[in-house]
């Protein structure tokens, strides 16, 4: 066994049998974090902008997916209408005390056909949004593609299944860097690149809805679950590295910004002390995180992926490996919960396999402190554990937490005490990670507003602010969590020290809403 493999197994065992050092507790505030650390909240273009058919925007693969009836007729055609209400929303961000706002640019709004002329109305909107944020002292953190590929490119050549996407994505990024880079320092190429490849090309639960029998969460009319996730991920990596090379060559010396990639990240722990489960937990990290992190740090896929997927996993040429290796200024994570992992190596004996069968493990949700079924467990070691893993396995690269938040039913409206408990636990856990030396630079809650959620449309809510979809003005109302986060950001301490003040504000907001 190589030294790297020995480390990974030993690290997994250590995380299982001994708790990570904890400094925190309930009493902490923004002032306990470095001044350079950024706290914010986030959104994405398709999920909040609305104005789906206005000012030159053309459909994305998400528009096509939603309009096909995947959510019983629900779409994001209007959603929060952030396209028209951005000034109001930025004012709320400033009042809350946000230091950063993570949002994405709609490729099909800026360049309607995916390539060619820039749409002046789209350009104006994003310039206005960026300037509005900066005028309120809020850093823009921009994602170039939050899974919303222009439908025109999907129709023309199959989108991320074709290497033609590399040139088009790089040209689109060039426009963004040229037009906005004088005011934007933090760029993320792709959101949840690992989940996009899986959901879009293996089990078909998200656009472009590719899968093949016996795999798939819903019927698919096209796809090959055994090969397409790996091909799409390969092209995502090549496109990302091309954009990073462009930025470093053309813009870095004048704009001084940073370009990273975003991954979805569970923290995976062995379900039992059995060696097979310990190895399975490491395999889960290799398949879900190492799939992208290994090429970006080391220049190639994890050995276990090459062994299990075999010829179905594309190979990097020597030049591609050199381009991908080191093509990262930071790695961003969307993290919501810890899972336990158990071995299912028997899946490797099947003749037809997809990504999950190659990974040969099963997820088991952990029991955690939560008050209602369907919500994420408040399992504190998760965030610190995954950051510690990146510190040890990948040399402690700069990290951002781009999404972290609690799911509640939309019917809960303003009384989201479970979200406050969740944020309290995870931000405290984040502080422990910072004090233990993790090179984490920022944290963004998901989400700032209740919006169109990509898993269930308007069935659940993650926002700090409730949006009344039945009101013609789509009125925003602060939840309990918005007041808690605001107090935290303004240095007023933990939930307990500000509880009475928050309860008074929430009661006032609830009464105002009831009388409107």
Tell where the protein language model's regions lie, with residue ranges:
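Intrinsically disordered, low-complexity segments enriched in Ser/Pro/Gly/Ala and basic residues
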Residues: 1, 17, 78, 310, ...
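Classical eukaryotic N-terminal signal peptides for Sec-dependent ER targeting/secretion
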Residues: 1-15, 21
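Active-site region of glycoside hydrolase catalytic domains
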Residues: 9, 22-70, 94, 113-115, ...
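Acidic/polar N-terminal loop/beta-strand segments that form early-domain functional surfaces
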Residues: 42-44, 88, 104-108
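Active-site mouth loops of central-metabolism enzymes
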Residues: 71-85, 161-163
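Active-site-flanking structural segment that lines cofactor/substrate pockets
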Residues: 78-101
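Short, well-structured secondary-structure segments
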Residues: 99-106, 139-143
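Glycine-rich, proline-tolerant flexible connector loops at the mouths of alpha/beta enzymes
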Residues: 105-118
């Amino acid at each position: 066994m190589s030294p790297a493999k020995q480390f990974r197994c030993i690290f997994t065992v250590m995380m299982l049998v001994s708790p990570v050092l904890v400094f925190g507790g309930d009493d902490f505030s923004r002032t306990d974090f470095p001044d350079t650390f950024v706290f914010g909240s986030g959104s994405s273009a398709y999920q909040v902008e609305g104005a789906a058919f206005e000012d030159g925007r053309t459909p994305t693969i998400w528009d096509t997916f939603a309009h096909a009836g995947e959510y019983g007729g629900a779409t994001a055609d209007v959603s929060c209408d952030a396209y028209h209400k951005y000034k109001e929303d930025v004012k709320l961000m400033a009042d809350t005390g946000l230091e950063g706002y993570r949002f994405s640019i709609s490729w099909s709004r800026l360049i309607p056909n995916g390539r060619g002329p820039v749409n002046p109305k789209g350009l104006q909107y994003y310039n206005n949004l960026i300037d509005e944020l900066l005028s309120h002292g809020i850093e823009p953190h921009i994602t170039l593609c939050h899974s919303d590929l222009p439908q025109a490119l999907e129709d023309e050549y199959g989108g991320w299944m074709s290497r033609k996407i590399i040139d088009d994505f790089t040209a689109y990024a060039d426009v963004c860097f040229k037009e906005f880079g004088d005011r934007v320092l933090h760029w993320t190429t792709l959101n949840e690149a690992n989940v996009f490849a899986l959901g879009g090309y293996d089990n078909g639960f998200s656009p472009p809805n590719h899968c093949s029998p016996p795999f798939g969460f819903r019927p698919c009319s096209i796809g090959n679950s055994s090969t397409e996730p790996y091909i799409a991920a390969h092209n995502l990596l090549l496109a990302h590295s091309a954009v990073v090379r462009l930025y470093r060559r053309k813009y870095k010396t004048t704009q001084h910004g940073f370009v990273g990639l975003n991954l979805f990240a569970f923290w995976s722990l062995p379900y039992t002390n059995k060696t097979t489960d310990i190895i399975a937990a490491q395999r889960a990290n290799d398949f879900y995180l190492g799939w992208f992190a290994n090429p970006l740090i080391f220049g190639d896929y994890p050995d276990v992926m090459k062994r299990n997927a075999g010829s179905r996993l594309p190979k990097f040429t020597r030049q591609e490996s050199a381009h991908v290796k080191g093509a990262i200024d930071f790695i961003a994570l969307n993290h919501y919960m810890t899972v336990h992992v158990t071995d299912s190596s028997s899946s490797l004996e099947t003749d037809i396999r997809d990504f999950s069968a190659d990974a040969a493990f099963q997820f088991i949700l952990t029991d955690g402190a939560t008050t209602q079924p369907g919500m994420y467990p408040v399992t504190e070691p998760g965030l610190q554990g995954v950051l510690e893993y990146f510190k040890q396995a990948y040399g402690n690269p700069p990290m951002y937490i781009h999404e972290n938040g609690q799911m509640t039913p939309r019917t809960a409206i303003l009384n989201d005490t479970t979200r406050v408990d969740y944020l309290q636990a995870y931000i405290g856990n984040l502080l422990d990670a910072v004090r233990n030396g993790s090179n984490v630079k920022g944290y963004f809650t998901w989400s700032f507003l209740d919006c169109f959620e990509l898993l269930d449309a308007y069935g659940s809510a993650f926002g700090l602010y409730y949006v009344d979809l039945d009101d013609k003005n789509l009125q925003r109302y602060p939840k309990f969590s918005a007041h808690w986060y605001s107090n935290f950001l303004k240095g007023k301490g933990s939930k307990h020290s500000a509880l009475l003040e928050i309860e008074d504000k929430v009661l006032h907001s609830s009464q105002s809403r009831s009388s409107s």
